[in-house]
Amino acid sequence: MPSSAHLQDPPPLLSRTLTQNEGQTSLRQSSSCGPSAASASESLSGSTESRIPHSKMLQGKLPRNIPLEYPAGLYCCYVVIIVLSVAVVALSVALSVKKTAQISTINTYAACPRNWIGVGNKCFYFNEIPSNWTLSQTLCKEQGAELARFDTEEELNFLRRYKGSSGYWFGLHRESSAHPWKWTDNTEYNNSVSIGGDEKHGFLSDNGFSSGRGYIVRKSICRKPNSYTSQCL
Amino acid sequence: MDTSRVYGNVKTFRSPGHKQASFPSLSTDACRCPHWHHLALKLGCATLILLLLTLIGLSVFVRFLVQKPLIEKCSMAAQENGTEPTGRSAILECPRHWQPHRNKCLIISQISRPWAEGLVACSMKEATLLIIENEEELKFVQNILKGRQQLFFIGLNYVQTEMTWKWINGSVLKPNILRITGSEVENSCALISHTEVFSDSCSSDNHWICQKTLKHV
């Protein structure tokens, strides 16, 4: 039995001695300057390593995230603002045009005098002061024109649409209701559009072409070639 | 020796504390830039709203100008009361779009047609072409026509067989009321402007003036 007791005793003794050895080694390390410096440098390097990646992460995130979100939103806002601004400007222009009620000329060559309207290679003038047919023709001639005639469908459609609801003298006339209609240059009318009424002087009404007595005072329409054509000639 | 060990441990804990302190400063830097962006965004949104409202206002205004004043055709429903034999009805006011003058209501046509068609159009409104009864009425009518560079048929035509101008109610034109400029030939009808009365062909296209007499019971 005592022999067994002896056998049991050695393990605790061995463990005690081991622990004592460990304590001695730690003391030695702490006492030496080299190991302490090494530990200090390690701690510094550790802190720098931990700091650097953190700062890198933050720096990386800011440029990555902010431009993706904010500038995109701003750009969208800018685009929308520009579009709306353009729309507002366009509407303002439309308003000013409507208010002044200026009718833009249909000049193809922009070679008609002021207040005349260009259609194809002709210029048309709407005389808003009423006068009889003969005086209307005289007033047209004073401007190097004749009472209006139409040579094309385009001119005819223009005259029909532009005159509004008033009656306008134009270039057709005849000697009597039994004679054929003629233009002011005495060329015969081709009757492409029938003329109402039984009189001798043609005018445009909102019902098409009509005829009346020449002494009646009405507005009138003049026509002449545009200067571009005359220049070419 | 043991106490020195403990101090070392405390130092190791402090270093992460320093690291944590650095985080808030970085986050505050990040907040400053977004703040400016937020301000810009707010201004942008305000501008957007302002532009949108302006756009809406202008659109409404332009549409308002574009819409031409509707020319409502003057349609008169037959007044059943008027047709009743009791005759209780009394028209004391002019219908819509008609111009009152003493005991008459006048209206100007929107279209041009020969005289006979004008006569029919008036009758469909339970009216007749205008009959001018005195000089005062002539002045009133011509005053209405100021600013209109148009001509209007009235209820006066030339009767070839009698060699005289007659109103459509059968009465003869009195020379002192109005003077007619132009030919006195067959198929002549009177046209009025704001200054003169002309004789023109009845088959010519012109506007016309209708009159409706107010009835008092």
Curated annotation (Swiss-Prot), chain A:
One of its GO terms (molecular function) is carbohydrate binding. CDD domains: CLECT_NK_receptors_like. It is found in: Cell membrane. Residues 16-29 have a biased composition (Polar residues). Residues 119-228 form the C-type lectin domain. Keywords: Cell membrane, Glycoprotein, Lectin, Membrane, Receptor, Signal-anchor, Transmembrane, Transmembrane helix. Residues 1-76 are cytoplasmic. GO terms for cellular component: cell surface; endoplasmic reticulum; external side of plasma membrane. It is a single-pass type II membrane protein. Glycans are attached at residue 132. InterPro entries: C-type_lectin-like, C-type_lectin-like/link_sf, C-type_lectin/matrix_domain, CTDL_fold, NKR-like_CTLD. GO terms for biological process: negative regulation of osteoclast differentiation; protection from natural killer cell mediated cytotoxicity. Residues 98-233 are extracellular. The chain crosses the membrane at residues 77-97. Residues 30-50 have a biased composition (Low complexity). Pfam families: Lectin_C (PF00059). Its main location: membrane. Residues 1-52 are annotated as: Disordered. PROSITE patterns: C_TYPE_LECTIN_2 (PS50041). Lectin-type cell surface receptor. This is C-type lectin domain family 2 member D5. The gene is Ocil.
Swiss-Prot record, chain B:
Its main location: membrane. Keywords: Disulfide bond, Lectin, Membrane, Signal-anchor, Transmembrane, Transmembrane helix. Residues 67-217 are extracellular. It is found in: Membrane. One of its GO terms (biological process) is regulation of natural killer cell mediated cytotoxicity. GO terms for molecular function: carbohydrate binding; signaling receptor activity. This is Killer cell lectin-like receptor subfamily B member 1F. It comes from Rattus norvegicus. The lineage of its organism: Eukaryota, Metazoa, Chordata, Craniata, Vertebrata. The gene is Klrb1f.
